């Protein structure tokens, strides 16, 4: 899962505070069986069509496709996604129960690469094994961000996209009202492709890790 958010200096909508990471888009790649996920068929993207408040529509769409009672919510740096889910649960109490169930099912892809002592203690590891990386490559240069991690495991690239990173996504969303109808539609499609790329990148990394441990 991946959110794209807009950190506005001034609160725009109900329940917000300055610089809150207000979600306007998400992408999901749904893996029903291990290793079985298609770039397009198993992808869900929600994107706000305007700069008006579409957060409740986003929540409804999220709950339409994520079963709060089973499965695992994967993200890279899952604390960010969990933070947005928790904020939405506070803003929309009518969806709080299901949103918090999803919140509690969050699992960080980084835990498989970097480390998570609590997780590995539960799995029976002790001592020095809890202090070491599970995986490292010099190309990471000390960073486990998705942009650094992806090239280690896949030739998937952001270079050919019209939107290349989260900052550019914010700029496109913030300029909705400055575009012509045709340009807005073009830019919105670019946002969808970019957000989809983020979650597909996680699928690629996860599948590569599966191959490593076989």
Indicate where each model-derived feature is located.
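Conserved RNase H-like, two-metal-ion catalytic cores of nucleic-acid enzymes
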Residues: 1-66
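Acidic active-site catalytic centers that drive phospho-/nucleotidyl reactions
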Residues: 2-4, 108, 198
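Active-site proximal loops enriched in glycine and acidic residues that flank catalytic Cys/His/Asp
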Residues: 3-5, 9, 30-32, 76-78, ...
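Hydrophobic alpha-helical membrane-insertion segments
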Residues: 11-13, 117, 207
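Active-site lining segments that contact anionic ligands and/or coordinate catalytic metals
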Residues: 23-25, 104, 188
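A generic secondary-structure signal for well-formed alpha-helical elements
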Residues: 30-32, 89-92, 153, 209-213
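Conserved DEDDh/DEDDy metal-dependent 3′-5′ exonuclease domain
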Residues: 42-166
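Acidic, Mg2+-coordinating catalytic module of metal-dependent nucleases/exonucleases
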Residues: 133-214
